[in-house]
Structures are given as C-alpha cells and as structure tokens.
Design a protein with these regions (language model features):
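Sec-dependent N-terminal signal peptides
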Residues: 6-10
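C-terminal motif of bacterial Sec signal peptides marking the signal peptidase cleavage site
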Residues: 13-16
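Compositionally biased intrinsically disordered regions enriched in Thr/Gly
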Residues: 18-266
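Positively charged n-region of N-terminal signal peptides that target proteins for export
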Residues: 1-4, 18-20
Length: 266
C-alpha cells in the first residue's frame, strides 16, 4: 500500500529544495499517516456466459496512524466519497477494509436487483447494462493544518459516454471536520467572492464580462456562484465545477483559482 505522511509545518530543507508551487506532501508535527486501501469486484448480472457485468475499483486513502486518525476516517466515511453513498450507512467500527467490502456487496446486490429484471426484458441492448465505477483518492496539503482530500470518479452506466468528476474535501486536522466557505471566510463574503469568481472565469475563457461568458456557453442563464467543491490554498481558493455544471459538456471539468481575497479570510 502506498503510504503518504502528512504533517503540518513544512520542513525547512524541503522548502529550500522544493520547486516553486510544488504541492506539499511531507510536513512536520501533528502527524497523520495515510494508506491507500484498494477494493475491487466484478459482478455478472446473470449466470449466463457473456452476461452484462459491473466492474468496481475503489482506491481510497484512510488515516492509519495519528491521534485523530479514527475521527478523520469517520468524517471521510460519512462525507459522500463514493456514489452510491453506501459508505455513510456503514458502521465501520474502525475496520475500513470491511467497510469497503460491505460497499461492494451492497453494490453487487443492488446491481442485480435493479438491472436483472430490465435485462430479462431487453436482451437486444446487452451493453446498456454494463457498469463501470472507478474511484481514486489522493491527499495533499496546500494550507497549514488542512488536509485536502480529492476523489476522482469515472462512472459508466450505459449510453455513449461515462461521467467523470472530482470531489474535494478540506479537512481540518485538529478537529477532523470538513470546512465550508462559511468556516474560513468572514460573514458577508458572498458578493465579493462571486465577483472574483466571475473575474476568474472571464480570465480563463477570455471574456470581458458575464454577458460574454454566457455567449461562450459558460454560466449561461445561471446566477454566478462559488462552487462548494473547492481546494483551500495559502491566500487562494481553487473552485472545481464538474462536467456540465456551469458549461456545455465539451468544456469538461472547469477549475479556477481565486486570489486577492486577503480581506475575506477569517
């Protein structure tokens, strides 16, 4: 299993050797050690040869050492990491591998329960009943005391294309809670932050204003908003808009970094 050790307060030698803008992965004091835990399954819809099948691959990160490891893991399990969100209903009792195995069993049972009757009546479209679910987590820290936890998901459930999206959580190491914008920004931040979001989108898509953004298919007929899917950084917030959230599918996932908000931080 791949191990990543997170600490909070960067080592001076790392700062000297690291390149500008390098992501911090090893820091010192108040340590939490994470391991990747992998779970896979392949489920055939029926016992017939060549029957449709569901393939699931989960590669998630969980804390294995550290004073707050259990609390961090409990937070992660109840944070909607994977869709369907079966993990939130599982009482892991500290056994993360057992929780993932339980997820796979429930996924397999629901796949057969929901798809088998449909397949029995629709043998001509066998490929439509194939499912793929891949979830891969990564952790980092871009801001002292905060673990950024991202899950990249690919889900195919019939049709032409699968869906890809990224989920980002910012976990305060000392409390194990997931931080929201309200937790880190001063009251009344909304108007100024919205303006900064529009400004960043205009820079990204070479637009002069919100109207031109809309003409380019971004935030068209949508009231601009900061995504609740974001990465906290030193002096900046990177917002993630999933595929088709604020623009057409061909633009894919959209990420913008909002800076110049020093007066908004708590």
């Amino acid at each position: 299993m791949k191990k990543i050790i997170l600490y909070f307060a960067i080592v001076a030698t790392m700062m000297a050797c690291g390149s500008k803008g390098e992501e911090k992965t090893i820091m010192e004091a108040e340590g939490l050690e994470f391991d990747s835990i992998v779970a896979d399954t392949l489920v055939r819809l029926t016992s017939e040869k060549g029957a449709p099948e569901a393939k699931v691959h989960l590669s998630l990160m969980f804390a294995t050492k550290g004073d707050n490891a259990k609390a961090v893991n409990d937070t992660l399990l109840h944070s909607g990491l994977v869709v369907p969100d079966y993990l939130s209903d599982i009482d892991a009792k500290g056994n993360i591998k057992a929780a993932l195995d339980t997820f796979l069993i429930r996924f397999a049972n629901d796949y057969k329960k929901n798809y088998a009757p449909l397949y029995q009546r629709d043998r001509e479209h066998k490929a439509s009943y194939n499912i793929v679910l891949n979830c891969k987590a990564k952790i980092n820290s871009y801001k002292d005391g905060i673990i950024n936890y991202q899950v990249e998901t690919y889900n195919y459930a019939g049709g032409k294309d699968g869906l890809r999206w990224t989920l980002s959580h910012n976990i305060e190491a000392k409390t194990a809670r997931i931080l929201t914008l309200d937790d880190v920004l001063v009251p009344g931040y909304e108007k100024q932050l919205k303006e900064k979001v529009v400004e960043a989108l205009c820079d990204k898509f070479d637009a002069d204003d919100l109207k031109e953004l809309g003409e380019k298919g971004v935030m068209y007929d949508i009231e601009p908003y900061p995504s609740n899917n974001f990465i906290l950084k030193d002096g900046a917030i990177e917002f993630i808009y999933v595929d088709s959230e604020i623009a057409a599918h061909d633009k894919g996932e959209i990420r913008i970094e909002v800076k110049g908000i020093d007066d908004l931080w708590k």
